[in-house]
Regions:
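Bacterial N-terminal signal peptides
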Residues: 7-18
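Flexible, glycine-rich phosphate/dinucleotide-binding loops
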Residues: 46, 180, 267
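N-terminal secretory signal peptides that target proteins for export/translocation
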Residues: 1-4
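Juxtacatalytic substrate-recognition/specificity segment
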Residues: 113-250, 358-362
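Acidic/His/Gly-enriched intrinsically disordered linker/tail segments
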Residues: 195-202, 226, 245-397
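Compositionally biased alpha-helical segments
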Residues: 20-149, 154-157
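Short, flexible beta-strand-to-coil junctions
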Residues: 52-54, 174-178, 337-340
């Protein structure tokens, strides 16, 4: 009897895991049409499918599929949610170490169309000029390391957990800054994330000069000697789940998270997370490590009330970007590392996943504390690290 129960249990576990292990699947709609595709995400009653035939992502209503496919999609969502729930309980990483010898595959080279496509394990790089495998490998390491960092953070951002075999994040590379700007890149930027609903996770656009590539003869060589915080920042946006852009989190947390990853000391495929506190403080209050970059807010910061700051429209947040990004970094770091544990930020992120937003979600973060008490705790924590934050009176209280 015991053996029968054990076999039944094992079979049940295998059946539960099967949908998670499958790659592409033949989906059938109610009219009998078939499509070979892989799920990239599901939101409410819409599923995004990466179609094998053309490599593009399409959004479809769940209702158009036959019952067995709808059940498969629901099971896929359930498995993703289980993975997210487990990730919340993982320890905070101290070191992200990425393999430097990553495999690069050339999937398309079309001189006439100026389209050259390269695959690393989790990224698709689409460039308007030919690059060697070795050059792509050099800069792809930073992309892969950033994704691994986001995957290891116990914040359950599912986009960082989707295997490259199912969905590669798209990166558009441009030979010239002029071409980058013509295609929508901000003139003063070194890279940008553009959210596109029908393009899966959106795209990141980067001019080659931002990757440290220099033209030598008819080819390119990698000669990057500086620090690149813009690219990890934009890559984090590409990997951040949509729920974390909801009101109450959009701005202070979505940008604070991107800043947190970007300022982490990085070298040769390694993010040294254990060294983050000094890097966070130096970047937010000064000009960063070695005087490169930084928000330079100073050691005494006069801030809006916490409630007004967290609930301000995103357009207002970006209108004063340098200050708000720096303060967002300090506050995000507080919730990650300066409370007794991460239970409050975890509960807040879970609430966002469940559909809460705005003040309703922030009440979960406060966990019974008043806004005045929350401000006092943040101020006290940072004062002990040499940063004095003074919050103004709220205009909405």
């Amino acid at each position: 009897m015991y053996m029968m129960k054990l076999v039944t249990l094992l079979l049940g576990c295998l059946l539960m895991l099967a949908p998670c292990e499958l790659g592409a699947r033949m989906f059938t709609d109610v009219d009998g049409s078939k499509i070979d595709a892989t799920i990239t995400k599901v939101e409410k009653d819409t599923v995004s499918l990466l179609v094998k035939a053309d490599g593009k992502v399409y959004d479809s209503r769940l209702s158009i599929f036959r019952p067995n496919d709808r059940n498969y999609i629901r099971e896929w969502v359930r498995r993703q949610e289980l993975e997210a729930a487990y990730n919340f309980d993982d320890p905070w990483p101290t070191l992200i170490n990425t393999d430097l010898d990553i495999e690069i595959e050339i999937t398309e080279e079309d001189e006439e169309k100026k389209r050259f496509v390269y695959h690393s394990p989790n990224y698709e790089f689409i460039c308007d000029v030919r690059l060697s495998k070795n050059v792509v490998k050099k800069f792809a390491t930073l992309f892969e390391a950033t994704r691994e960092y986001c995957r290891m953070l116990p914040i359950a951002t599912l986009k960082a957990h989707v295997p490259g075999a199912q969905f590669r994040n798209k990166i558009l590379l441009f030979e010239s800054k002029a071409s980058y700007v013509r295609n929508g890149g901000p003139p003063s930027s070194a890279g940008v994330f553009i959210s596109r609903g029908r393009q899966g996770n959106g795209i990141v656009m980067v001019p080659l000069e931002s990757l440290g590539l220099k033209k030598v003869g008819s080819g390119y060589m990698y000669d990057y000697k500086g620090e690149n915080k813009v690219l990890p920042h934009e890559l984090v946006h590409q990997l951040t789940d949509r729920e974390y852009y909801r009101s109450g989190a959009r701005g202070w947390f979505s940008e604070g998270l991107a800043e947190y990853v970007a300022v982490t000391p990085y070298r040769s495929g390694k993010f040294m997370v254990r060294s983050n506190l000094s890097a966070v403080k130096a970047y937010a209050t000064e000009y960063g490590k070695k005087g490169k970059g930084g928000r330079a807010l100073g050691d005494e910061i006069i801030a809006p009330s916490l409630k007004d700051y967290m609930l301000q429209p995103y357009s207002e947040f970006t209108a004063n970007a340098n200050f708000n990004y720096g303060l967002g970094l300090l506050i995000t770091n507080y919730y990650f590392h300066m409370e007794e544990d991460r239970s409050n930020i975890t509960a807040f992120l879970r609430a966002l996943k469940r559909g809460k937003q705005g003040e309703e979600a922030l009440r979960v973060l406060l966990n019974g504390r008043s806004w005045d008490e929350m401000e006092e705790q943040i101020t006290k924590a940072w004062r002990s690290r040499g940063v004095k934050i003074t919050f103004r009176e709220s205009v909405s209280r």
